[in-house]
């Protein structure tokens, strides 16, 4: 039995089928109805005081737009090209462990939804199905693979070789989990995800250093992303090691508490990289306006983790596709109202520092939700 009343929009029950979702609020509301308290808190929670989680949202809410007018925006193009593929949106569905908590088939409906819509998916190494099974289930999807290091050099190299052999277009090392954080929502309920229960060998992650990056770049021909970059200094080191993708992330506020918001970090990373690598970013990106802000600030791809989980829990593959359709509509409208006909036209001149209009929390971008986020 669910511990909370169902979460609904302010005036209407949530739709029964994915095609009937009219906004992202309704997807989240349906996910809440379908999830037990533990799995819900796994999505919405962060580390310790959840300061980093809230700063992610506050940083996005602290950017306002500077629109231009009297420009032809009768046709707006939201697409980009990365990893040799045209994507309908500059979006990668970010690596999330234990997706099987939100759907019995885990990452499979996500990858199939990504293929159906036309964006990228990054599979977590602590998620079902494994990389071979997902490749078999969604051979034509744009698949990337993210690894938590739980073994020695040979173990890591084996994962790279398997990813290459099964058609993954990129390989990602997560580097901000040298120690596992205190996620106090989970601790309070003695809840341990399936991904955490089966994972061993965390000492290898704690000992990880730049020699692993150097070895991967020397031995393998696959685009490499480093996930967890939060400073200009580390971005420069990564680029000096030949890393193709700098992934700005604080693990969604789920690792180091009292960190900066991801989009606060982005400008210094963009300046440090100076065009020598592409940039991904995640951390509270959940609306089309958030995606536009990230691209204007210098990112190339925007990772979306929590929205992926909500969509998966709401309606499986169809929910993922509908979530992406709604995001595309939001991005297209935002660009048109900014006076911009394509993402390539965006730059920092379209952004302005401003005071947030609401107190930030993980779902403060969805004011129509009936949610007391502070009690669980």
Where are the predicted features?
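Internal helix-turn-beta structural module
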Residues: 317-358
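An N-cap/entry alpha-helix motif that binds or orients negatively charged groups
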Residues: 2-84, 183, 192-203, 207-208, ...
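A gly/proline- and charged-residue-enriched helix-loop-helix capping module
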Residues: 116-137, 141-156
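A compact, surface-exposed functional segment
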Residues: 293-320, 353-357, 370-376
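Short, basic, glycine/proline-bearing loop/turn elements
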Residues: 92-98, 141-148, 198
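Glycine-rich active-site/cofactor-binding loop and its immediate structural neighborhood
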Residues: 87-129
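Alpha/beta enzyme core
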Residues: 98, 111-112, 133-137, 151-281, ...
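Conserved active-site and cofactor/substrate-binding residues in soluble primary-metabolism enzymes
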Residues: 22, 47, 51-55, 105, ...
């Amino acid at each position: 039995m669910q511990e909370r009343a169902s979460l609904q929009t302010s005036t209407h029950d949530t739709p029964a089928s994915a095609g009937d979702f009219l906004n992202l609020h309704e997807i989240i509301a349906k996910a809440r109805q379908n999830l037990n308290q533990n799995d819900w808190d796994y999505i919405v929670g962060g580390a310790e005081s959840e300061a980093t989680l809230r700063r992610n949202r506050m940083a996005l809410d602290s950017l306002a737009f500077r629109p231009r007018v009297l420009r032809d925006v009768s046709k707006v193009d939201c697409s980009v090209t990365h990893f040799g593929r045209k994507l309908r949106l500059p979006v990668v569905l970010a690596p999330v462990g234990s997706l099987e908590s939100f759907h019995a088939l885990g990452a499979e409906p996500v990858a199939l939804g990504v293929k159906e819509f036309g964006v990228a998916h990054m599979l977590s190494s602590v998620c079902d199905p494994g990389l071979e099974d997902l490749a078999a289930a969604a051979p034509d999807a744009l698949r990337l693979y993210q690894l938590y290091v739980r073994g020695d050099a040979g173990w890591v190299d084996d994962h790279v070789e398997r990813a290459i052999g099964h058609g993954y277009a990129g390989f990602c090392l997560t580097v901000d989990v040298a120690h596992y954080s205190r996620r106090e929502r989970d601790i309070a309920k003695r809840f341990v995800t399936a991904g955490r229960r089966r994972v061993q060998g965390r000492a290898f992650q704690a000992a990880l250093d730049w020699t692993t990056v150097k070895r991967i770049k020397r031995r393998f021909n696959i685009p490499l992303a480093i996930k967890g970059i939060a400073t200009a200094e580390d971005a420069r080191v990564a680029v000096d090691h030949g890393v193709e993708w700098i992934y700005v992330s604080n693990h969604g506020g789920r690792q180091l508490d009292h960190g900066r918001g991801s989009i606060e970090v982005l400008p210094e990373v963009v300046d440090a990289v100076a065009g020598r690598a592409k940039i991904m970013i995640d951390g509270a990106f959940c609306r089309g306006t958030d995606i536009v802000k990230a691209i204007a600030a210098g990112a190339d791809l925007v990772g979306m983790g929590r929205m992926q989980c909500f969509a998966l829990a709401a309606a499986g593959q169809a929910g993922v596709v509908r979530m992406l359709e709604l995001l595309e509509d939001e991005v297209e409208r935002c660009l048109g109202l900014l006076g911009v006909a394509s993402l390539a036209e965006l730059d920092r001149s379209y952004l302005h520092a401003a005071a947030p209009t609401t107190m930030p929390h993980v779902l403060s971008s969805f004011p129509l939700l009936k949610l007391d986020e502070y009690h669980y």
